[in-house]
C-alpha cells in the first residue's frame, strides 16, 4: 500500500513536472513563435530596406554615371579649351609679330616721312630761291624791255635823223656818219637784248618744269603717308580684336575650370554617399 502511495506520489510529481514542462514548453513555443514572427518582421523590414538600398544604389549609380559623363564632357571641353588657348596663343604670337613688323614699317615710314619733310623744306627753300631769282630775272627782263624800247626809240630817232641827213647830205655829211654809227650800235644792242630775252624765257620754262616736278614728288609723299597711316590703323584694329578675343577665351577657360571643379566636388560627394550606403549594407 505504501508502495502504491509512493508510486502515486511519484506519478503525481511526474504529472506536475510534466505539466510544468508542458507549460514551460508552451511558453517556450510561444516565445519561439513570437521570436519567429519578430524575425519574419525583421526579415521583411530588412528586405524592404535592402530593396530601398538597392534602388538607392541604382539611383546613385545613375547619378555617378551622369556625373562621369558630365565630367568627361567637362574634361573634353577643358581639352578643347586648352587647344583653343594654344591656338589663340599662336594667333596672338603671329599678331604680335605682325604688329612688330607694322611698327618697324611705321618707324621706317616715319623716318622716310621725316626725310621727305626735310627734302620738302629744302625744296621749299629752293623754290623760294628760284622764285627770288625769277623775280630778279623778271626785273632784269623788264629793264631789258625798257632798254629795248629806248633802243627802238633811238633807232627811230636815228632813222628820222638819217632821213634828215639824207635831205641835207651836202650840208650835214659829218653828222650823217655819226648818226649811222649810233644806229649800228643801237642795232647791236637790240640783238643782245633779244638774246638775253630768249635766255630769260628758257630759264622761266625750266623753273616751271622744276616746280611741276616738286609738286609731283609732294603728291607722291602724301599718298605714301596716307597708305602708311591706313596700314597702321588696320594693325591697331587687329591688335584690339586679338585682345578682346584673348579676354573672352580667358573668361571661357575660367568658367570651364569652375564647372570642372564643381563636377569633381559633386562626384566626390556622390562617391562618399555611395561608400556609406555600401558600408550600411555590409554591416547588415
Curated annotation (Swiss-Prot):
Modified residues (N-acetylmethionine): 1
Keywords: Acetylation, Actin-binding, Coiled coil, Cytoplasm, Cytoskeleton, Muscle protein, Phosphoprotein
This protein's record includes keyword ATP-binding: no
Phosphotyrosine modified-residue sites: 261
UniProt cross-references to InterPro entries, sorted A to Z: Tropomyosin
Maturation and modification: Phosphorylated on Ser-61 by PIK3CG. Phosphorylation on Ser-61 is required for ADRB2 internalization.
Any one GO biological process: actin filament organization
Recorded domain comment: The molecule is in a coiled coil structure that is formed by 2 polypeptide chains. The sequence exhibits a prominent seven-residues periodicity.
Function: Binds to actin filaments in muscle and non-muscle cells. Plays a central role, in association with the troponin complex, in the calcium dependent regulation of vertebrate striated muscle contraction. Smooth muscle contraction is regulated by interaction with caldesmon. In non-muscle cells is implicated in stabilizing cytoskeleton actin filaments. The non-muscle isoform may have a role in agonist-mediated receptor internalization.
Name recorded for this polypeptide: Tropomyosin beta chain
Organism the protein comes from: Rattus norvegicus
Amino acid at each position: 500500500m505504501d508502495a502504491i502511495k509512493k508510486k502515486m506520489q511519484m506519478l503525481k510529481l511526474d504529472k506536475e513536472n510534466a505539466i510544468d514542462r508542458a507549460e514551460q514548453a508552451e511558453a517556450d513555443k510561444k516565445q519561439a513563435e513570437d521570436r519567429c514572427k519578430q524575425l519574419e518582421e525583421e526579415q521583411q523590414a530588412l528586405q524592404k530596406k535592402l530593396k530601398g538600398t538597392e534602388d538607392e544604389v541604382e539611383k546613385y549609380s545613375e547619378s555617378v554615371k551622369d556625373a562621369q559623363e558630365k565630367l568627361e564632357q567637362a574634361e573634353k571641353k577643358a581639352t578643347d579649351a586648352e587647344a583653343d588657348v594654344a591656338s589663340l596663343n599662336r594667333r596672338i604670337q603671329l599678331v604680335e609679330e605682325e604688329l612688330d613688323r607694322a611698327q618697324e614699317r611705321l618707324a621706317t615710314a616715319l623716318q622716310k616721312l621725316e626725310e621727305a619733310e626735310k627734302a620738302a623744306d629744302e625744296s621749299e627753300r629752293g623754290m623760294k630761291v628760284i622764285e627770288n631769282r625769277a623775280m630778279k630775272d623778271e626785273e632784269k627782263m623788264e629793264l631789258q624791255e625798257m632798254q629795248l624800247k629806248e633802243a627802238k626809240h633811238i633807232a627811230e630817232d636815228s632813222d628820222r635823223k638819217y632821213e634828215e641827213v639824207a635831205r641835207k647830205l651836202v650840208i650835214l655829211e659829218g653828222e650823217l656818219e655819226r648818226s649811222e654809227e649810233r644806229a649800228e650800235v643801237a642795232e647791236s644792242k637790240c640783238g643782245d637784248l633779244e638774246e638775253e630775252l630768249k635766255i630769260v624765257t628758257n630759264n622761266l620754262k625750266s623753273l616751271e618744269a622744276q616746280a611741276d616736278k616738286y609738286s609731283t614728288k609732294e603728291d607722291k609723299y602724301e599718298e605714301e603717308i596716307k597708305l602708311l597711316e591706313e596700314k597702321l590703323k588696320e594693325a591697331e584694329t587687329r591688335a584690339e580684336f586679338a585682345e578682346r578675343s584673348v579676354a573672352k577665351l580667358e573668361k571661357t577657360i575660367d568658367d570651364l575650370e569652375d564647372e570642372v571643379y564643381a563636377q569633381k566636388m559633386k562626384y566626390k560627394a556622390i562617391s562618399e554617399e555611395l561608400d556609406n550606403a555600401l558600408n550600411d549594407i555590409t554591416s547588415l
